[in-house]
């Protein structure tokens, strides 16, 4: 077993001299170091992010609510700026738009989600109140980094979660994080020193060459999933693309970390640690090359489309959560239109009021769409019972909604395509998406 190096303060916490919660979280940290194969702990100087109280408290740590309360009363705080990830429907979220979403029978038998008492009880608000006192900013989003107004800078050590977020932290911001965001890392301000915290592990090993100039949102989405499947845990350097915008970064990141487990990549000239292709590889040669041909993109598109009927029951947009510009552009597309089938639009709570103030919420409501926030369909317990064919514009959502919550008869099917394809489906109830549309 690895003997993890500890300073005097860490030893005191591990021995229980500073209370139960510090001891339990230090035990967890030491065990994580041993699992990761490192004897070193890194002090965090960036930001942290973790999922909801129920998930964190139940699976990560063995102490009671009362012990946490004692810690807070004694002045315990998170040691780094800490944000909350999206929430399962049965706890805190959606903050807005959950009423009448036809999910009442899911996961809790006959207990209705629109029962206000049940909803408040299920929020675990007592944990969130303590977390607020400890300094948590409750963004309730998979893309907290887009609304936090405070992001880590290049080289800072962080502790994040979420598929689109980890590559964003490492590749786009140039900060450093593994997939280990938790109460423990944020409370201690410490994490195991391995993988993306180590400079040598951040250099590219696989060269990705694109035959087609990647420039549209869906092309980036498909490319991300394809690279993830091919590269797995490797660090790719990607060539043959236009310069991605924020939305396209998020879509590719989510696809990469769904099709595979890519925490880091480089796009020479677009990401901060790769001013050149040579710099991306740290002066070394690629181990191998991945060639992204038209047939690779087509095969990935077809894999994410699995439906035998063109009749669509529901459309879902907002995986990852839509940012402010996404909401503005979507409002332009929906203004003056009327949906024929349910259209759910998901964003983060801090942007819901922005959408309301800017008039986007009214446009969505007038169109018959539902703006929701703080969660996602994969965290809500699946789809409403009437949905057997859903249209999405996200590789991640296509993958997770059927993988996490297959229905009893395995009848849930997915139509995957551009946002415009999805809007057309919402207006007509029919799927008319096609691979030829992906460049639009």
Would you name each region that the model predicts?
Residues 1-440:
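Non-transmembrane, aqueous-exposed alpha-helical and coiled segments at domain scale
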């Amino acid at each position: 077993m690895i003997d993890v190096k500890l300073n005097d303060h860490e030893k005191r916490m591990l021995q229980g001299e500073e209370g139960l919660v510090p001891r339990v979280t230090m035990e967890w940290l030491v065990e994580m170091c041993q699992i990761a194969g490192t004897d070193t702990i890194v002090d965090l100087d960036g930001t942290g992010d973790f999922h909801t109280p129920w998930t964190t408290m139940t699976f990560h740590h063995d102490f009671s609510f009362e012990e946490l309360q004692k810690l807070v009363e004694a002045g315990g705080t998170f040691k780094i700026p800490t944000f909350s990830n999206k929430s399962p429907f049965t706890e805190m979220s959606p903050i807005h738009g959950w009423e009448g979403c036809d999910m009442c029978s899911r996961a809790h038998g006959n207990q209705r989600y629109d029962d206000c008492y049940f909803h408040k009880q299920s929020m675990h608000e007592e944990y969130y109140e303590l977390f607020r006192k400890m300094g948590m900013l409750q963004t309730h989003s998979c893309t907290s980094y887009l609304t936090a107004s405070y992001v880590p800078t290049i080289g800072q050590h962080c502790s994040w979660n979420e598929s689109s977020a980890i590559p964003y932290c490492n590749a786009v911001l140039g900060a450093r994080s593994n997939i280990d965001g938790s109460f423990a890392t944020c409370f201690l301000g410490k994490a195991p020193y391995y993988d993306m915290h180590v400079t040598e592990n951040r250099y590219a090993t696989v060269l990705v060459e694109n035959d087609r100039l990647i420039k549209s949102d869906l092309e980036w989405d498909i490319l991300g999933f394809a690279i993830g499947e091919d590269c797995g845990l490797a660090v790719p350097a990607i060539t043959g693309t236009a310069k991605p915008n924020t939305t396209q970064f998020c879509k590719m990141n989510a696809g990469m970390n769904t099709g595979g487990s890519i925490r880091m990549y480089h796009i020479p000239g677009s990401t901060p640690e790769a001013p050149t292709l040579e710099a991306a590889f740290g002066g070394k040669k690629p181990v191998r090359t991945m060639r992204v041909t038209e047939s690779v993109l087509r095969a990935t598109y077809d894999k994410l489309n699995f439906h035998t009927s063109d009749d669509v029951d529901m459309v879902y947009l907002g995986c990852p959560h839509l940012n402010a510009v996404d909401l503005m552009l979507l409002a332009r597309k929906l203004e003056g239109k009327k949906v024929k089938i349910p259209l759910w639009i998901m964003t983060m709570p801090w942007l819901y009021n922005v959408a309301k103030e800017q008039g986007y919420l009214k446009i969505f409501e007038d169109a018959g769409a539902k703006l929701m926030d703080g969660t996602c369909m994969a965290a809500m317990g699946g789809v409403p019972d009437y949905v057997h064919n859903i249209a999405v514009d996200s590789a991640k959502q296509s993958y997770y909604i059927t993988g996490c919550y297959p229905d009893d008869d395995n009848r849930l099917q997915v139509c995957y395509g551009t946002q415009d394809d999805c809007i057309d489906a919402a207006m007509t109830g029919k799927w008319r998406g096609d691979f030829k549309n992906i460049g639009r």
